[in-house]
Amino acid sequence: KAGEKNAVVSLHIYDLKTKKTSKVDLGKYTDFYIPRIKWTNDANVLSAQVLNRHQNNLDLLFIDGNTADFKIVLNEKDKAYVDITDNLTFLDDNSFIWTSEKDGFNHIYHYDKNGKLKNQITKGNWDVTNYYGFDNKNSKIFYQSVENGSTKRDVYSIDLNGKNKKRLSQNNGTNNATFSPNFDLFINNYS
């Protein structure tokens, strides 16, 4: 209920071989949530997003699955709140794609495996309104945005380096997409 204390959150890793559980020491955090947990492409590294109660300060942690030690690879702060999404995508080299409103608009960013910004993939005074995914074979990102006007949502592809942007939707209005698993085909829903 609003105003009541949050549940106490803890994070543990269970090793199937040794049958031992390791607790991740999150003692530096108080009154927090863990809204997302996801394995990276490194089999021994777990990612966890730790968010303060006010939901305006988020740390992305990389946790060593063997030792339960962690490092903060990314921090997001906002005066109002940090939007939680399921857009975190790990690439083969364990670099990752992340969406953020840190420049005032929701855009797509590429970070290396240590959390160092490689490049801002999308840029402009408009928002990415949906992140559809990453085509590893062709190094392309697929997304929806309002870059053609606030009442128009179009579907795009763009290279990981931020070049070769291509509008995929043909009609003006609201376009949504559902992509095939290999990103070779998509269904365009238009209204």
Residue ranges and their predicted role:
Residues 1-191:
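Beta-propeller folds
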